[in-house]
Amino acid sequence: MSNESKCPFKHTAGEGTSNRDWWPGQLNLKILHQHSRLSDPMAEGFDYAAEFKTLDLAAVKRDLQALMTDSQPWWPADFGHYGPLFIRMAWHSAGTYRIADGRGGAGGGQQRFAPLNSWPDNVSLDKARRLIWPIKQKYGRKISWADLIILTGNVALESMGFKTFGFAGGRQDVWEPEDNVYWGSETTWLDDQRYSGDRELENPLGAVQMGLIYVNPEGPNGNPDPLAAARDIRETFARMAMDDEETVALIAGGHTFGKTHGAGPATHVGPEPEAAGLEEQGLGWKSSFGTGVGGDAITSGLEVIWTTTPTRWSNDFFDHLFGYEWELTTSPAGAHQWRPKAGAGADSVPDPHDPNKRRTPSMLTTDLSLRFDPAYEAISRRFHEHPEQLAEAFSRAWFKLTHRDMGPRARYLGPEVPAEELIWQDPIPAVNHPLIDAQDIQQLKGQILNSGLSVAQLVSTAWASASTFRGSDKRGGANGARIRLAPQKDWEVNQPQQLAQVLQGLEALQSAFNSAQSTGKRVSLADLIVLGGCAAVELAAKNAGYSISVPFAPGRMDASQEQTDVESFAVLEPVADGFRNYLKPVSGITAEALLVDRAQLLTLTAPQLTVLLGGLRVLGANVGQSPHGVFTSRPGTLSNDFFVNLLDMGTQWKPQSEARDLYEGSDRATGQYKWSGTRVDLLLGSNSQLRALAEVYAAADAGEQFVKDFVAAWDKVMNLDRFDLR
C-alpha cells in the first residue's frame, strides 16, 4: 500500500452539477447580488471620490509620460513608444459600452476580468495593463484601475502631440466579473449567431461577433468588402451613441498611431489569460513565433502600419487613404488587408523595431470604408482638407467614448474636467435658489393629498419618473423632471393622459407655492413629483394602520427640452416594467427575465424587488389601472395582501392564453373566480427563492416589516440619481 497521502475528496466546494445545468432556463437572481461587501477588499466606508481628490494627478501623468518611452524587453514598445498600445487599451475598455441597456464601458475596470480580459479582440492588452501596474501600485487606492486605464490613454495621446478635450475621474473599481452583461449566446469565439434576417443585429449587443469590441477589421465575417463593412461600422458605432462624424473621427484619429500585429500564423499563439497556466501569472497568448514579442508579435493577425508618423499626431491617415489606390493582399498570418497598388508608397513608413528597415503603408478593410461609403467619404474628405476639424472632432469623440458610461457631470472628479456642458451628459441646471424646508414639505404634502389626485396616480407618476434610472450608465432618474418632456411624456408605459393630469395638478401647486415666496425659495417640479409619491405612500401606510415618515430630500431641478436629446433618451423607454405590470412582447425573452433585468438596472436586491412589486400592486400602480396582480380588496392601502393572497393554497391558478402570459386564480373548492395575474405576479409564488422572500412578507406578523421595507426600497429608487447626496 502506498504511503502517499490520499485526499478523501474528489471535488471541492462550488464544483459539481449546478442548478443551471439541471434547469438551463432557471431565472438568474444572482445578478441582483453582485459586488457586495463580501467581495470588496476595501475598508467599510471607503470613499473613492475622497481618495481621488487627494491624488496628485499631475504627478501620475508625469509617471505615465515617462513610461511611454521606457521600453521593456519582456514586451518591447513599437517605434519605441507605448502610446498606441495604451490608446487601444483605453479604447477597448470604454468601447464595450452600448446604449440599449447602458451596460459595458470603462466603469469598474472590467477589462481586468473574464470574459473581457480573454476576448480575442483584447489580445496583448494584458501586457498593457501589466506595464502600468507599477504606477497603480505606487498610487494605490487614490486611483482606480478603471480611472488609470482611461487616464493612460489620454496621456498617450498627449505624449504624441494631441490636445485632449479633458479627463474626469470617478470610476470606482469592482472586484469580480459582472455576470449581468449579456455579451451574446454564442459558445465559440468570433461566432455571429446574433444576426437574423437582413443582417439585423440582436439587441442590446453592439459588436458584430462574440469577442470583438466593434466590427471585424477584415470585413463582415472576414469578407473584405469596404461597403459591407461600412454598414456594420455604422450600426455598431450608433449602438454606442456615435454618429457618422464621430465614427470617422474615432477611426481616423485612432489609426493615426501605431500598428496592428500579425507577424505569423495564429497557430503559434497560446491560450488566453483565463486558460493559461499558473506560471503565466495572469498573462496569456504566449507566442512561439520567433521571440514572440516585438517584431514577432501576433495580436489580431493583421500587419498594418497606417502612417509615416505612428507616434505623432498628423493628418497622414487621410493623406494615405486618398493618396493611394488600394489592392487586396494578406498579412503574414493570412488575414485580409490592403496595400497601395503598383508598389506605391514602398519604404515610406518606419519599421517598428529596426531603424534600418522601412515598410509600405497599409490599410484595413474597415479603413477603406471611410473612403468608399458615400457619407463617410464626404466627412473624411472634409477632415482631410481641414485637419483642425478632425482634431476637434476626435478630441470630443474620444472624450465621449471614454466618459459615456459615467453619467452626469456631477460624478466627474479632478482638475481636468471640461467646463463645457455637453448634451450627451443629460445636463440638469444647478440649484440656484433656497430649498424647501421641513415645514414647507409638510405643507406641500397636505396640498398634494388634497388636490384630488389619487394614491395610485401619485405613486405611479413618481415611480415612472424615478425608475428610468440605469445603474449601468447612471442615466435617467427623477432629477430633471424629464417625464414632462419628450420623449418620456409620450411613452405608453407612462400613461400620457393620466400623466398630463397629474403634472397639471402638481404644476399648479408649484406655481402657487413659488409665487408666494418672498425669499427666493423655490420648489422644482422634479421634487414635487417625488414628494407626491412619498405623501401617497405615507397615506397608504396610514390606511393600513402604520404611521411612518417616508424620507424626502429636496434639491432636484427641472431640465429643459433643449437640454434633452430626444433620440438619446428614447433608448431608456422600457419594453417591460414588471413593477407596473407592463409588457411589450419581446421575442425570446420572458416577462420574468425582463423583470429581473429591470431590477438589476435599478440596483435592487431580490428582497427589494419582492417588497416593491408587492407594494406597488396594492397601491394600484399598474399601467392602465389593470387589475392583474392586485390581490387585495382594499387598493390604496399599503398592506401585505398581495403576498397573503398569492400564497393562499385555497387558490388554484390556470393559464388563460396559449402564450401563458395571463393566469386566472379561482377558489380551489368552488371554482369561483378570485384574481387575475401575469407571469410576473405568479413568479413570486413559483420561483423557490422569491417564494421564500414572499413568505416572509405573507406572515401574520409581517405587516409592519413589510411597510418599513417597502419605504426603504422606495426611498432608494427615488434617490438613485441623487449623486449630490452621496
Curated annotation (Swiss-Prot):
Q: Which UniProt keywords apply?
A: Heme, Hydrogen peroxide, Iron, Metal-binding, Oxidoreductase, Peroxidase
From the UniProt entry, list the residue stretches annotated as the region Disordered.
335-362
Q: Which SUPFAM superfamilies match?
A: Heme-dependent peroxidases
Cross-referenced InterPro entries, in alphabetical order? Catalase_peroxidase, Haem_peroxidase, Haem_peroxidase_sf, Peroxidases_AS, Peroxidases_heam-ligand_BS
Coiled coil regions in record: none
Cofactor dependence is on:
heme b
Query: Which EC class is the enzyme in?
Result: oxidoreductase
The EC number(s) this enzyme carries: 1.11.1.21
GO:BP terms for this protein? cellular response to hydrogen peroxide; hydrogen peroxide catabolic process
Q: PROSITE patterns per the record?
A: PEROXIDASE_1 (PS00435), PEROXIDASE_2 (PS00436), PEROXIDASE_4 (PS50873)
Query: Binding residues for heme b, per the UniProt record?
Result: 255
Reported modifications of this chain = Formation of the three residue Trp-Tyr-Met cross-link is important for the catalase, but not the peroxidase activity of the enzyme.
GO MF annotations for this entry? Answer: catalase activity; heme binding; metal ion binding
Where does it sit, as one GO cellular component term? cytosol
Q: Identify the residue position(s) of the site Transition state stabilizer.
A: 88
Task: Please tell me which positions the record assigns to the cross-link Tryptophyl-tyrosyl-methioninium (Tyr-Met) (with W-91).
Answer: 214-240
**Mind telling me where the Tryptophyl-tyrosyl-methioninium (Trp-Tyr) (with M-240) cross-link is?**
91-214
Active-site residues from the entry: 92 (proton acceptor)
**What note does UniProt attach to the cofactor annotation?**
Binds 1 heme b (iron(II)-protoporphyrin IX) group per dimer.
Q: Which reaction does it catalyse?
A: H2O2 + AH2 = A + 2 H2O; 2 H2O2 = O2 + 2 H2O
Q: So what family is this one in? A: Belongs to the peroxidase family. Peroxidase/catalase subfamily.
Spell out the protein name for this chain.
Answer: Catalase-peroxidase
Gene that specifies this protein:
katG
